[in-house]
Design a protein with these regions (language model features):
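Conserved glycine-rich cofactor-binding loop
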Residues: 7, 12-16
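Conserved mid-core segment of classical short-chain dehydrogenase/reductases
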Residues: 66, 89-104, 144-147
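Catalytic Tyr-X3-Lys loop
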Residues: 88, 99-116, 131, 155
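C-terminal helical subdomain
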Residues: 175, 183, 187-229
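The beta1-alpha1 cofactor-binding region of Rossmann-like NAD(H)/NADP(H)-dependent oxidoreductases
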Residues: 56-68
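Active-site helix of classical SDR
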Residues: 118, 151
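Residue(s) in the substrate-gating loop at a strand-loop-helix junction
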Residues: 135
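Rossmann-fold scaffold of SDR-type NAD(P)-dependent oxidoreductases
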Residues: 11, 79-87, 110, 132
Length: 241
């Protein structure tokens, strides 16, 4: 992926990893659009990053996802990078009364949203790069967040297939695999002792400069590579031709 002179859309870009990525991409001389549900968060992001373009939308609504694509296709048809970053994580137990409602919300946000956006944004003639933000929990589930872990395992698997499916179109598919970081994902204060997002961003941008397509940090470097000497040749044989 070239690191400058792109036009980039980052979903969930008003906070956490998304906002940090937006800041770094802007520093690298890119035009960045962020979308999010809360106007207040978008306004705060705009105050921090005056050049960022903001778009309010509720990505859990199919109509809003389609409207976002239509707006980009009309107003920013030269957009060439999609970053599927939006996600939700909730602690839950299978015996909880609200388990299914929480699980449904995570499935919608973490699976349906990036699937639909990827399908639609592939129609943009300028699109040449997709970054999918998964998680180290895609490889080793954390039982406090069982559905989140499963959705990220799905998204990791889909990303592998997507990379092969769009190879002939010269579209690069990059997987961003964060560990727990000092953000409010899952709840305020849960990750106060985790590494800062800034360290993660520095690491993955160094890997982007090296041309890597799986961007890892800390323990995710280990878990994402476990068993790859067995997996990769089987994956290649299964999907050749």
């Amino acid at each position: 992926m070239k690191l400058t002179n792109n036009k980039i859309l980052i979903t969930g870009g008003a906070s956490g990893i998304g906002l940090a990525m937006a800041e770094r991409f802007i520093q690298e001389n890119n035009t960045v659009i962020i979308c999010g549900r809360r106007d207040s968060a978008l306004e705060e992001a705009k105050e921090k990053l005056p050049s960022v373009i903001t778009k309010q939308c509720d990505l859990t609504l199919e109509a809003d996802r389609s409207a976002l694509f239509e707006w980009v296709a009309k107003e920013h048809s030269d957009l060439n990078v999609l970053v599927n970053n939006a996600g939700v994580q909730q602690w839950m137990n299978i015996s909880d009364d609200d388990f299914f409602s929480k699980a449904s919300q995570e499935i919608k946000t973490n699976i349906e949203v990036p699937l639909q956006l990827t399908w639609q944004f592939l129609k943009l003639p300028a699109l040449d790069t997709i970054l999918n933000v998964t998680s180290g929990l895609a490889f080793v589930p954390f039982t406090k967040v069982p559905v989140y872990s499963a959705t990220k395992a799905f998204f990791h698997s889909f990303t592998l297939s997507l990379r092969e499916l769009v190879k002939s179109k010269n579209i690069e598919v990059i997987e961003v695999i964060p560990p727990a970081l000092n953000t409010d994902l899952g709840g305020i204060g849960l990750h106060d002792h985790a590494p800062p997002v800034s360290d993660f961003i520095s690491a993955i941008f160094a890997q982007l400069e090296e041309g890597k397509v799986e961007l890892t940090f800390g323990f995710t470097e280990t878990v994402s590579q476990a068993g790859q000497e067995v997996f990769k040749p089987i994956f290649s044989r299964l999907n050749q031709g």
